[in-house]
UniProtKB/Swiss-Prot annotation:
Residues 30-61 are annotated as: Alpha. The lineage of its organism: Eukaryota, Metazoa, Chordata, Craniata, Vertebrata. The modification N-acetylmethionine is found at M1. A divalent metal cation 7 binds at C50, C57, C59, C60. This is Metallothionein-II, hippocampal. GO terms for biological process: cellular response to cadmium ion; cellular response to copper ion; cellular response to zinc ion; detoxification of copper ion; intracellular zinc ion homeostasis; negative regulation of growth. GO terms for molecular function: metal ion binding; zinc ion binding. A divalent metal cation 5 binds at C34, C36, C37, C50. InterPro entries: Metalthion_dom_sf, Metalthion_dom_sf_vert, Metalthion_vert, Metalthion_vert_metal_BS. A divalent metal cation 6 binds at C37, C41, C44, C60. A divalent metal cation 2 binds at C7, C13, C15, C26. Pfam families: Metallothio (PF00131). Metallothioneins have a high content of cysteine residues that bind various heavy metals; these proteins are transcriptionally regulated by both heavy metals and glucocorticoids. This isoform may play a role in regulating the transport, accumulation, and compartmentation of zinc in the hippocampus. Keywords: Acetylation, Metal-binding, Metal-thiolate cluster.
Length: 61
């Protein structure tokens, strides 16, 4: 559990624009909370599924 995120590892969460997640490990996370997505990723805000670094992110590949 990320102390700065209200979701468990592998779970799902919907972060507000002011999301403070620093190491979000959610299976699915909305908004720009996921560190795997580069800044400005339009698809990430629609519901990115993070699986690793930016080059492995399903929404930005």
């Amino acid at each position: 559990m990320d102390p700065n995120c209200s979701c468990a590892t592998g779970g799902s969460c919907t972060c507000a624009n002011s999301c403070t997640c620093k190491a979000c490990k959610c299976a699915s996370c909305k908004k720009s909370c996921c560190s795997c997505c580069p800044v400005g990723c339009a698809k990430c805000a629609q519901g990115c599924i993070c699986k690793g670094a930016s080059d492995k992110c399903s929404c930005c590949a």
